[in-house]
Amino acid sequence: MAGYRADDDYDYLFKVVLIGDSGVGKSNLLSRFTRNEFSLESKSTIGVEFATRSLNVNEKVIKAQIWDTAGQERYRAITSAYYRGAVGALLVYDVTRHSTFENVERWLRELRDHTDPNIVVMLVGNKSDLRHLVAVQTEDAKSFAENESLYFMETSALESTNVENAFSEVLTQIYHVVSKKAMEAGEDSGNVPSKGEKIDVDVSAVKKTGCCSN
């Protein structure tokens, strides 16, 4: 079960990036998950931002270091440094703006150009609270996620719907990759990450199947 832990007490550190068009709610997803806060007056972030939160997964403490694109997406200026070392990603679109969903494919291509193609990726349809304004049908997004072997959820940072679930699922799947690699390494302790070590997972070693939930 997920829970808050002290920042300096963890077994693994996983870097997760938030990507997607400007204004889809990435910063509010980050603040809702890490601080349980939401701002209706959220302004575009300037400069690289990241926040952390620790969760319990299978009796291990996973510290998530979650990076926000910080407004750079407006200028197509996201650099390889932003993606470097990322083992998970939330690819966010706004369910009320179809253009943000149309751009998901480009974001995914850029992500895969800079990371392992089998990085754990969750497609996130944010602002699900605006039901009367929905422009992207759930089935369309789910179909895209299945075709690309992505996980999928619809969230509302405003109402805190599925925010916890989306981040937790990504972190749990990353942990499963790490656990599988550690088991395959056998008893050679030199191949098993030490406590507190930052993990850059070569997830290509594990064939991942897509999973969709709503």
Swiss-Prot record:
Expression tissues: Expressed in the vesicle-rich apical dome of growing root hairs.
Pfam families registered for this protein in UniProt: Ras (PF00071)
Keywords: Endosome, Golgi apparatus, GTP-binding, Lipoprotein, Membrane, Nucleotide-binding, Prenylation, Protein transport, Transport
Motif Effector region per UniProt: ranges: 42-50
GO CC annotation, single: plasmodesma
InterPro entries (alphabetical): P-loop_NTPase (IPR027417), Rab_GTPases_membrane_traffic (IPR050209), Small_GTP-bd (IPR005225), Small_GTPase (IPR001806)
Main location: membrane
GO BP field: cell wall biogenesis; protein transport
Molecular function terms from GO: GTP binding; GTPase activity
Binding site for GTP: 20-27, 68-72, 126-129, 156-157
Membrane topology according to the record: Lipid-anchor
SUPFAM superfamilies from the UniProt entry: P-loop containing nucleoside triphosphate hydrolases (SSF52540)
Location within or outside the cell: Early endosome membrane; Golgi apparatus, trans-Golgi network membrane
Lipidated positions per record (S-geranylgeranyl cysteine): 211-212
PANTHER family for the chain: DRAB11-RELATED
Function: Intracellular vesicle trafficking and protein transport.
Family: Belongs to the small GTPase superfamily. Rab family.
Entry protein name: Ras-related protein RABA1d
Species of the source: Arabidopsis thaliana (Mouse-ear cress)
Lineage: Eukaryota, Viridiplantae, Streptophyta, Embryophyta, Tracheophyta
